[in-house]
């Protein structure tokens, strides 16, 4: 029981509110402390954008909604829409998959059990099905 228990929630500067809201619903007193910021790294993404354009990437894997947001920020305006074929996207879980879908992109893999082991298993299963189709 967490009613009136003080909980220190250490998180990103712009966090998902699910945990905080869940704790507050059961009466916990939340102290929020942001300790890091999710922002795109300043590097040259030209190589990867070219890989996307030339359909040389089999999958794009996202492990968090902030990764999706930051990826979207590095894309030049209209880039995704200009791709000849949309790349396959895999997400660690349903919240990350929702972030992908919010941009209008399709998700091909998002395991029900949200951990890396099941994500890899999902990718292997999907790739096996694709291989069988083309044999």
Language model feature labels by segment:
Residues 1-135:
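Conserved beta-alpha
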């Amino acid at each position: 029981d967490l009613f009136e228990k003080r909980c220190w929630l250490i998180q990103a500067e712009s966090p998902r509110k699910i945990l905080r809201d869940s704790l507050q619903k059961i009466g916990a007193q939340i102290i929020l402390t942001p300790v890091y910021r999710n922002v795109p790294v300043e590097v040259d993404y030209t190589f990867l954008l070219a890989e996307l354009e030339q359909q040389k990437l089999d999958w794009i894997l996202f492990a968090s909604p902030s990764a999706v947001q930051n990826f979207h920020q590095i894309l030049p305006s209209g880039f995704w829409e200009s791709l000849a074929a949309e790349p396959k996207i895999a997400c660690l879980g349903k919240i990350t998959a929702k972030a992908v879908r919010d941009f209008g992109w399709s998700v091909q893999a998002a395991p029900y059990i949200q951990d890396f082991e099941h994500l890899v298993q999902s990718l292997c299963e999907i790739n096996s099905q694709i291989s069988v189709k083309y044999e």
